[in-house]
Amino acid sequence: MKKIMILLSAVLFCLAPAAAATADSLALKDITGGSYSPGYVYGVTPMADGESYSRLSDDRKRIVRHSFKTGKEIGTVFDVEKAKGVKLKGFDGYVLSPDENRILIQTQTKAIYRRSFTAVYYIYDVRTGKLEPLSDGGPQQVPLFSPDGNQVAFVRGGNLFLVKLLYGNAESQVTKDGKFNEIINGIPDWVNEEEFSTNRSFDFNADGTMLAWVRYDESQVPIYDMQEFKGLSPERMEYDEYPGSYRYKYPVAGARNATVSVLTFDIKNRVTRTMKVPMDSDSYVPRIKFTDNADKLAIVTLNRLQNQMDIYIGNPRSTECTLAVRETAKKYIGESAYGSLKFFGNNFAYLSDRDGFRHLYLYNLSGQLVKQVTRGSYDVTDFYGRDPKTGAFYYASRQESPLRKAVYCTDKNGREKKLSTETGTNSAIFSQGLRYFMNVYSSAALPPVTTLRSAADGKLLTTLVDNAALKQRIEPLLAQHEFFTFTTSEGVQLNGWMVKPRDFDPAKRYPVIMYQYSGPGSQEVTDSWNLGFFGGALYESYMAGKGYIYVIVDGRGTGGRGAEFEQCTYLQLGDKESKDQVETALYLGKLPYVDKERIAIWGWSFGGFNTLMSMSEGRPAFRAGVAVAAP
């Protein structure tokens, strides 16, 4: 990526006169190398006691427990140097059993796609201190404990396996038809993983007597050949002189997808059944999840056009399924609907934009709407959970502004309380039991600040990371930046962000670089430290130091402004998005300090696609453009 950024900068430098580097300027190698990266608290796992969280130590040798109230280290959950049996030098991650008496220790991790990976797992018994292999059959994927912690299911080679920890880690194979590029059990194929943001498609029921999973038959999906080079895969010495090829099933838009079905396995009787899910042959199953009732399996289906989502409640033994909720949309149903789905007792809740904005709805398992939890002309972005004792719901929303996000709770009577106190962008990780939360706050002017707070009233308990030193270091180096809005010739108001040189002179005319992503539901213009390509306005300030004005505008199709604004691009991607970027360039060209003859546009992925669409829109608004990794 560094080489690409240097090439991009070189291409765009033709638009502006050279500017001399100074001792107090940003260096591109420092930006791309992470020298200005803010500090975070990574890998937080809330613990069962509701009072603490665990995380992997920086040296990757321990699992450390911290207090949710003080943030202080209060114990060690696992230490490679003290474990009996297998000896490890370190590890990559871990999974706690629900009762926290056992831990899966993740080692030798190898990435597959964006979210999928294989790893060699070891099982650690907290009570005995013994560490031993989970399986001797090879690396595993997405291992999952049963609710009682006595079993582990995982995927290997497209098949599901089960390990019974009370029987000497006895391993059995649940499925046998898994085959690369043909049949996959329990984990999604590439397109389902990528588009539905998941890497696991199986679950245990509440009493650990049943397994359910999605089976993907991709035998009829077209094959795509992707070249592999030694430069990106140094271990592949055979590609030193000539590239190799990775062949996998990749359905382009409109092509045949994998055919999906939902199966169950009776662990005691070893009987496999196929659920009778009423769905079309080209439908998706983005989620399955057992409820708190061991005999009730929730199956979420989505039609090919993604404008109808059905939630079925099925019996894993009789295989009969009953429709609980049918969600329909004029355009499409976003990932937040099935991605936010949570079950608790005899109820479930999820996010829907059926009234024009994304809000939280509560149902019972029979499919009856209990109530609409939130309402208003704003989007709820995250659903954190419901307190079983008080009935309070915890969530984040853009109630204050499409550019900002805050954390809230609503009690059982509908009274809302704001828990985050800072204006900007807030994200939370709640303790089990929802007594505390870790809040990460940032703004366009402030690097992330991580704090611990009370979930009752948002009271600050302690600050874990404030990035004050980083702020002090880079504040003198950042260029002027400001938010703005303008209205297009079609009457659409768009939000934007502009970075000007530190020595900006309104009497001069400056060349402009426009960056955009523009993908459905995305947001680049937010009051957060994530602003810009590398965050913190760093790259944009660097380019401003070279004599450019840098502009980012979120056009139609982006998120945070309700369903109509976000979904108006349905089935016509690249049309309205490109028009809005051209409108941005035309608007900028009318500003007295902009040289309208020197406006460039660029973007990455969907942003690369929209760069090409914008430059070929018909109105000659751009002098240059760079499309990186355009689909």
Q: Where do the model's predicted regions map?
A:
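A short helix->beta-strand "capping" segment at the edge of beta-propeller domains
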Residues: 22-39, 267-276
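Predominantly five- to eight-bladed beta-propeller fold
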Residues: 34, 71-72, 108-113, 117-120, ...
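Conserved beta-propeller blade repeats
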Residues: 37-56, 83-103, 121, 137-155, ...
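Beta-propeller domains
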Residues: 55-82
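Structural motif
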Residues: 60-65, 113-120, 157-163, 220-226, ...
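Short loop/turn segments that connect beta-strands within beta-propeller blades
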Residues: 68-71, 125-129, 165-168, 266-270, ...
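Beta-propeller fold detector
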Residues: 73-80, 132-135, 170-179, 273-276, ...
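Serine-hydrolase catalytic core recognition
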Residues: 294, 426-631
